[in-house]
Amino acid sequence: MKISGVDIRPGNIIEYEGGIWRAVKIQHTQPGKGGAYMQVEMKNLIDGRKNNVRFRSAETVERVRLDTKDFQFLFAEGEDLTFMDKDTYEQITLPRDLLGDAAAFLQDGMDVVMELYEERPISVQLPDQVEATIVEADAVVKGQTASSSYKPAMLDNGVRVMVPPHISSGTRIVVDVYEQTYVRRAD
């Protein structure tokens, strides 16, 4: 399906110069002279290269539809992650860097959605939010109202997030996987 260059949104998969790219960041610019354009930071889904491209409103690009399948995360071994197709029970091993920073939030038995292009895994989507345990939290400085009231804390998966002062070690919290931010205390 063809779309205008200014209709590209973050997360869209497009075909550009013979490659399959995911739009990562978008910035709409309207200079004083000339027509408006969309500055798009893209990541190649096959080889991981990044590219910044300027699309004018008159340009069109092909939007690619990916197939999605439900998988379950089984285990990690070194830099390899093993998933199981929930329909066929087939196992597939993927490199950890395909998931980027989100790989730290994988938990045994977690359900994920895998995006496939021509039967080849392109990306893995985790749930937007997961539960994690605080293993270390800095002390709160009383009376410090001039600055933000959040403090740094370390999760059980090694990721550091900013949490409210009432959160202490051993507390289970809900974390946004892609923003790596505190959402709320777990129930």
Curated annotation (Swiss-Prot):
Gene Ontology biological-process entries: peptide biosynthetic process
Gene3D superfamilies: 2.30.30.30, Nucleic acid-binding proteins
GO MF terms held by the record: translation elongation factor activity
Principal cellular location given in the protein's record: cytoplasm
HAMAP family for the chain: EF_P
Biological function: Involved in peptide bond synthesis. Stimulates efficient translation and peptide-bond synthesis on native or reconstituted 70S ribosomes in vitro. Probably functions indirectly by altering the affinity of the ribosome for aminoacyl-tRNA, thus increasing their reactivity as acceptors for peptidyl transferase.
Protein name as annotated: Elongation factor P
Annotated organism of origin: Rhizorhabdus wittichii (strain DSM 6014 / CCUG 31198 / JCM 15750 / NBRC 105917 / EY 4224 / RW1)
